[in-house]
């Protein structure tokens, strides 16, 4: 219950959380601290609606690498991670090697990102961009079915 509740509402007070869990406030706080210490809770954050801030383009970029041009896969991972426009980056198996989720104000700034940043990275063999037309599901939580709440 603790993990699921915190994913849905990270701003819930410890008092309200303890009532939901059915244990005392100090015991609830101790469990949350143990979950943080164990790395189960990685961070508390705010989810921003980027469109309301004028970032209207979400691009999904599929990339394949030219391994003969790479000095290291770790190096290219660092280059992708350093790009401010990239909000998610996954190394994947299958036809492509990476998928990037890119946020941009408009198609012009997206093109500038592609032309001035992404295509300048050595070792990329293939780039294919797709654009999100509609977000059907953007669930940033995963509801866990844990009988004993991770025994923390």
Residue spans for each PLM region:
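A compositional/biophysical signature of low hydrophobicity enriched in polar/charged and small residues
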Residues: 1-152
């Amino acid at each position: 219950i603790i993990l699921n509740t915190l994913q849905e509402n990270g701003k819930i007070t410890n008092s309200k959380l303890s009532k939901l869990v059915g244990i005392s406030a100090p015991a609830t706080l101790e469990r949350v601290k143990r979950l943080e210490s164990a790395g189960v809770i990685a961070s508390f954050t705010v989810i921003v609606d980027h469109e309301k801030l004028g970032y209207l383009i979400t691009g999904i970029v599929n990339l394949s690498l030219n391994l003969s041009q790479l000095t290291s896969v770790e190096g290219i991972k660092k280059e992708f991670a350093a790009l401010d426009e990239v909000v998610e980056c996954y190394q994947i198996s299958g036809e492509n090697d990476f998928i990037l989720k890119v946020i941009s104000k408009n198609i012009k700034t997206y093109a500038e990102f592609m032309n001035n940043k992404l295509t300048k990275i050595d070792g990329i063999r293939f780039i294919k961009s797709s654009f999100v037309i509609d977000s059907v599901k953007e669930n940033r939580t995963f509801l866990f079915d844990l009988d004993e709440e991770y025994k923390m």
